[in-house]
């Protein structure tokens, strides 16, 4: 039963990240700004670092295969690391039982750190793919916009969900 539960959670996470990346996006210059990171954060917060890694890796990679296949392999690793990192930090935060204001500040630090790793990963990827860091610098703006939007969406969803009993369950 536990394995089926994990498979269902991972399938839902992959689906949410795929939809929020491939469908809920806006073109900014030559880049797509999407809300996938917000759902990676939600999945990683609710279900832990492995669920964040799986949802980030597979959901984002599938979205890239549908929208921008040249970066799909890189996305698999970048978004997986982002989900894993956020999940590890948020698990640490939850286990410390901080006051709500401190928990929010710590979660903000986790979001910013994870987004920074994502932005660095795509900067290095695009420098490699295009052979020039100048071209990769252009994408920093759209990745920054995407990060800010995703952090805002995460906080909206987090604050809506945090009073629901789902957050208080230990068996997830």
Give the location of each predicted region.
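Loop-helix junctions at membrane interfaces
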Residues: 1-172
């Amino acid at each position: 039963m536990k394995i089926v539960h994990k498979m269902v959670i991972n399938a839902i996470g992959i689906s949410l990240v795929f939809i929020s990346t491939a469908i809920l996006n806006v073109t900014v210059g030559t880049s797509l700004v999407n809300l996938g990171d917000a759902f990676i954060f939600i999945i990683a917060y609710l279900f832990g670092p492995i669920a964040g890694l799986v949802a980030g890796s597979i959901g984002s990679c599938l979205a890239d295969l549908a929208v921008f296949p040249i970066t799909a392999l890189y996305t698999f690793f970048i978004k997986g690391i982002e989900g894993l990192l956020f999940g590890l930090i948020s698990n640490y935060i939850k286990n410390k039982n901080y006051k709500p204001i401190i928990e929010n500040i710590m979660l903000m630090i986790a979001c910013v750190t994870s987004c920074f790793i994502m932005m660095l990963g795509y900067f290095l990827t695009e420098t490699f793919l295009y052979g020039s860091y100048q071209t990769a610098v252009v994408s920093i703006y759209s990745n920054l916009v995407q990060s800010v939007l995703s952090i805002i969406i995460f906080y909206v969803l987090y604050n809506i969900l945090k009073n629901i009993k789902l957050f208080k369950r230990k068996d997830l």
